[in-house]
């Protein structure tokens, strides 16, 4: 549980102090919103499904970049 709190604090710190991390977080939120919009449609076309997969991959890539920055910050804090 303590690790989760430390991660939350680290994310909050990066959101306040790191413009690149903040940009990634905003991109991730926007991509999540776009995916949810497609998923909420009553009828999803093949083009919608392709777009949804593209957005999900992009969202995952941004999340990976954020996690990489968090990991770098963890090491900087320890070292």
Please give the residue ranges for each predicted region.
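Extended, charge-rich alpha-helical interface modules
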Residues: 1-79
């Amino acid at each position: 549980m303590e690790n989760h709190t430390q991660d939350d604090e680290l994310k909050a710190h990066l959101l306040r102090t790191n413009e690149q991390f903040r940009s990634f977080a905003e991109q991730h939120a926007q991509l999540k919103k776009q995916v949810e919009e497609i998923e909420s449609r009553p009828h999803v076309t093949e083009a919608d499904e392709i777009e949804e997969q593209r957005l999900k991959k992009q969202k995952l890539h941004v999340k990976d970049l954020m996690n990489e920055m968090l990991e770098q910050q963890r090491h900087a804090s320890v070292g």
